[in-house]
A protein has these predicted regions:
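Charge-rich, well-structured scaffold segments of protease-associated domains
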Residues: 1-8, 58, 66-69, 224, ...
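Active-site cores that bind ATP or allylic diphosphates and position pyrophosphate for catalysis
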Residues: 41-184, 189-198, 204, 229, ...
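Short, conserved secondary-structure transition motifs
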Residues: 26-34, 187-192
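Short secondary-structure transition/capping motifs
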Residues: 24-31, 50, 157
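Short amphipathic alpha-helical segments at helix boundaries and their inter-helical linkers
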Residues: 33, 72-73, 231-234
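A glycine-rich helix N-cap at a beta->alpha junction
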Residues: 3-27
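Conserved nucleotide- and phosphate/pyrophosphate-binding catalytic cores
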Residues: 7-13, 119, 130, 145, ...
């Protein structure tokens, strides 16, 4: 789904599971053995430790913390186990996870390119699980290992990851690796400033394709999220955006994902697009509306469709809307219930006015 969306939007990439590259494999499922290796290496370096606490103890711990009004978090119970105790439990096959050993004192500072320095007290940060009991890594470990081995220099992600970043910085320190530059982008918001979620909004990019938004329109609209050219320009191509983009100019105000604005932007690109190409893109929507039997049209039919699209694209926000608005070009009998109702009301009103004037003289009518 992600690959399909990127290809549709012409967002090319030089490495990945489907194109290869020098730093593969690119699927975490194919890098599974790496994570266990590096987790145990971190234990040997003193940056992590084995935790043998079972579910019952952890649940009791959470209940006690809740009763005392404390934030939930691991209490470091296994952090002080002796080497002999650890070896004994490992030999006995006691299930374990591997946790990050966060410093108890001091601060961790995130040097964020957009936000400046963000400071966290180490004592308030939990000892994060890095490797689960089933041998699978958590995001925190896999993310750091992969980014290091793949030579990642810049991590650009949503601001919701800021609270996790101190753990990531400590992981880089524990491994002795250079941390990348962190850039945390503002989250997209609904009109009411709430966070966009899958439960409330269509967040799949392919959904917008199926609804009839042009890729040029959607890319343009997304390029306006938290970013401005400065001269008021709102309509641009992907290449223009690439040529002018400066990440230091991204604003942090939480851009609003406004479907009305998206519709306007998309309409601008519909009017700019070559009429023949726009017609070809609209044909599947004509088929979906039942106006065409299939997408195979003759040259003569295509020329007719071009004329229809040329007229209707002026006011349509999407290809789907354009097709719906073209109904009267394809049907013999056409009526709009709301128009019919308004017309009948107008006739009734006129009829009443005439009745009121039945006994009026010409002078009285003129006075009115």
């Amino acid at each position: 789904m992600i690959f399909d969306a990127l290809k549709w939007l012409d967002l090319d990439y030089s490495e990945g599971p489907d194109v290869g590259g020098d730093y593969g494999p690119y699927r975490q499922s194919e890098r599974f053995d790496l994570y266990g290796k590096y987790a145990k290496e971190l234990v040997e370096k003193g940056g992590a430790y084995y935790c043998f606490c079972d579910h019952e103890r952890l649940e009791n711990l959470r209940e006690r913390q809740k009763a005392m009004g404390l934030p939930p978090g691991y209490d470091g119970h296994c952090r002080s186990l002796s080497k002999e105790e650890i070896e004994e439990k490992l030999k006995a096959g006691v299930p374990y996870v591997i946790r990050l050993k966060m410093p108890y004192e001091g601060e961790t500072v995130i040097h964020d390119r957009l936000r400046g320095d963000v400071v966290f007290e180490n004592s308030k940060i939990d000892d994060q699980i890095l490797l689960k009991a089933d041998g699978y890594p958590t995001y925190h470990l896999a993310n750091i290992v992969d980014d290091h081995l793949m030579g990642i220099t810049h991590v650009i992600r949503a601001e919701e990851w800021i609270p996790s970043t101190p753990k990531h910085i400590q992981l880089y320190k524990a491994f002795g690796w250079k941390a990348p530059e962190f850039i945390h982008m503002p989250l997209l918001r609904n009109d009411d400033r709430s966070k966009i979620s899958k439960r409330k909004n269509p967040v799949s990019l392919i959904w917008y394709k199926e609804e009839g938004y042009l890729k040029e329109g959607l890319v343009n609209f997304l390029g306006l999220m938290g970013y401005s050219y400065g001269d008021g320009q709102e309509i641009f191509t992907l290449q223009e955006f690439k040529d002018n983009f400066n990440i230091d100019k991204v604003t942090l105000g939480g851009p609003v994902f406004d479907l009305v604005k998206l519709g306007w932007v998309n309409n601008q690109h519909m009017k700019m697009k070559d009429l023949g190409e726009l017609t070809r893109l609209t044909i599947p929507f004509f088929v979906n509306e039942g106006y065409l039997e299939n997408e195979n049209v003759s040259d003569k039919e295509f020329e007719t469709l071009k004329k229809i699209v040329g007229i209707e694209r002026e006011g349509a926000k999407t290809l789907k809307e354009l097709a719906k608005n073209s109904k009267f070009f394809f049907v013999d009998e056409f009526s709009l219930p709301e128009v019919k109702e308004a017309f009948l009301k107008a006739i009734e009103a006129a009829e009443q006015v005439l009745k009121d004037h039945e006994t009026s003289t010409q002078d009285q009518v003129n006075d009115r």
